[in-house]
């Protein structure tokens, strides 16, 4: 069952060692996928891990590339994305206005960790040509305010 909002006492700025740690505490349940949630209820969390070249992160707005279309061996975008699967969960979040937890892979003390950035909401989405020349879904997220 997805939880929309903060988990336990975790707050923005908290750091997590790896994807397993995120999953175990319920911050982001999938251990590999970048989107947690369902088509019916929406996305409860996303991870920006540097896997998609079209992602953009700023404090006041995140442009999150949809999932799909990447070659699993090279990580490169090789086909157009489609409004299916986890992308439908993000679209549903835009429709419901529910908050999405955002986690971001960051450099920390010579290594990498996942930082909880806080709650965001999906304000819009559209298809656009990505850096590799294929159609990519772009989801815009802004900090969530009640």
What kind of region is each of these model predictions?
Residues 1-115:
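Acidic, glycine-rich low-complexity segments with interspersed aromatic residues
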Residues 109-146:
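Compact mixed alphabeta submodule
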């Amino acid at each position: 069952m997805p939880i929309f909002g903060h988990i336990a006492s975790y707050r923005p700025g908290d750091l997590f060692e790896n994807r397993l740690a995120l999953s175990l505490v319920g911050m982001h349940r999938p251990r590999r996928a970048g989107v947690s949630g369902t088509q019916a209820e929406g996305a409860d969390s996303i991870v920006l891990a540097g896997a998609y070249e079209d992602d953009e992160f700023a404090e006041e707005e995140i442009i999150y590339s949809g999932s799909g279309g990447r070659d699993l061996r090279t990580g490169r975008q090789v086909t157009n994305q489609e409004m299916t699967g986890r992308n439908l969960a993000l679209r549903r979040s835009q429709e419901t206005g529910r908050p999405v937890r955002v986690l971001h892979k960051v450099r920390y003390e010579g290594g990498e960790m996942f930082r909880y950035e806080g709650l965001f909401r999906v304000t819009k989405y559209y298809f656009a040509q990505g850096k590799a020349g294929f159609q990519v879904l772009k989801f815009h997220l802004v900090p969530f305010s009640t």
